[in-house]
A protein has these predicted regions:
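Interface-prone segments of viral and bacterial extracellular assemblies
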Residues: 1-221
């Protein structure tokens, strides 16, 4: 539906400098991570003068590791060269010294923790995105029974990393999440968001068709 056809993220870097990002980031969305850990994700350099990096757009669980061209950096509250500090409340990291020439700064990210909860299952992440990013009312707009049931079927943790939240459509993210448990998503007739899983057939078959019976397959319409 239309509400899920737009970008995952509505905001973008202004490109005016400082925490709003340099000119090279103008119009780009912030990085987004859910669940995880999401390994080896390239962080955005927001403020080169102050060595400020972004790995999300809100409160996050943790930046579990940070590397400069593969070499690990050490976390410290007052970083010096070879170290960094981590602000999980805003998903920002600050380097203690200038990175190496042609540096690529990558991290292992434990994702979004809005409201104090780190959601890690595909159903919980999908629901959180629908509510916080697309304005779906919870529980009024959610098929809560379906989401609860899928958390029992697919309780394993997943990781979702998006380098630019403006370049990915919400519906595509939902498709990727439900694919992790052979599932589907959509809206019911009462407009509630629902999910399900395509499981193997159950019960006694009324007929069987194999290579002997099937001569050809021809669409009827």
């Amino acid at each position: 539906t239309d509400v899920f056809d737009g970008p995952l993220q509505d905001s973008e870097f202004a490109g005016t400098g400082g925490v709003d990002g340099g000119a090279e980031l103008k119009g780009r969305g912030e990085p987004i991570a859910y669940g995880g850990p999401c390994f080896n994700c390239e962080l955005a350099v927001v403020d080169r003068a102050n060595l400020l990096l972004a790995y999300g757009d809100g409160a996050y669980e943790d930046l579990a590791a940070l590397r400069d061209r593969g070499s690990p950096l050490t976390e410290d509250a007052t970083p010096v060269a070879g170290e960094y500090s981590d602000d999980t409340a805003n998903a920002r990291a600050t380097l203690g010294g200038s990175p190496s020439p042609n540096s690529v700064l990558t991290g292992d990210i434990e994702g979004d923790k809005r409201g104090g909860t780190w959601r890690r299952t595909a159903p919980d992440i999908l629901r959180e995105i629908a509510v916080t990013r697309r304005g779906i009312a919870d529980p009024a707009g959610i098929d809560t029974a379906a989401f609860d049931a899928l958390n029992l079927v697919a309780p394993g943790p997943v990781g979702l990393w998006v380098a630019d939240g403006r370049q990915v459509m919400t519906a595509d993210v939902f498709d990727a999440l439900v694919a992790s448990f052979a599932g589907y998503w959509g809206q019911r007739r009462d407009n509630r968001l629902t999910i399900g899983r395509i499981g193997p057939p159950v019960g006694t078959p009324v007929a069987r068709f194999g290579p002997t019976e099937i001569i050809s397959i021809r669409p009827l319409a």
